[in-house]
């Protein structure tokens, strides 16, 4: 009971003060690009082939809109917790203090922590609400992968130009190059995170009997 509440509070704090804070800085940059280049015309590609005109700003606005929607959903999701004893029946609680309404008391306590009360559980909280957040993070990460892919192609097409950073080596044999390594790393890191999040979402929601 203590652990599921403690971990939920840590996760909640991490999402708010680390993940969403970092993501907000990315959203601000994309918003700046969308506004600054709203009239910068370029040729769009469908299936990798020349299509119709678009603007760089509009394409950035698409990613901003997608991220904004998912972030709003994430902020609205709550984490469920339990405080109902060894097998979720408040048995020991009731034996010790039979005159207390334990369901109402534990709900009030958990709500005060900014969490949601799950009254029907086994020994462990089912983690469905946590899995829901994991899946949503996967969607956000997939949007970031899509963004990184497109930025990689904009650089390749010469639409965007990278600035050389002192101390960075573009290539072991071609030092004149500036490879889009940060976007490539972002793809890999987000993909790895998604693999772990999907596994955790699938694993944590399965429990043998009461545990």
Residue ranges of predicted features:
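Conserved, well-structured ligand/cofactor-binding cores
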Residues: 2-211
């Amino acid at each position: 009971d203590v652990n599921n509440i403690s971990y939920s509070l840590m996760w909640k704090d991490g999402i708010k003060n680390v993940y969403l804070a970092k993501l907000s800085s990315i959203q601000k940059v994309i918003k700046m690009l969308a506004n600054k280049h709203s009239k910068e015309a370029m040729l769009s590609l469908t299936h990798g082939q020349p299509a119709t005109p678009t603007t760089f700003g509009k394409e950035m606005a698409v990613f901003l809109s997608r991220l904004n929607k998912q972030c709003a959903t994430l902020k609205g999701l709550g984490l469920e917790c339990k405080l109902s004893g060894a097998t979720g029946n408040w048995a020991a609680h009731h034996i010790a203090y039979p005159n207390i309404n334990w369901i109402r008391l534990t709900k009030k306590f958990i709500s005060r922590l900014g969490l949601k009360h799950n009254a029907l559980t086994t020994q462990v909280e089912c983690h469905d609400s946590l899995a829901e957040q994991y899946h949503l993070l996967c969607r956000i990460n997939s949007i970031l992968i899509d963004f990184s892919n497109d930025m990689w192609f904009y650089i390749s097409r010469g639409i965007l130009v990278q600035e050389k950073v002192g101390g960075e080596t573009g290539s072991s044999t071609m030092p004149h190059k500036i490879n889009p390594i940060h976007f490539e790393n972002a793809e890999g890191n987000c993909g790895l995170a998604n693999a772990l999040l999907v596994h955790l979402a699938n694993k944590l929601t399965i429990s043998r009997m009461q545990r």
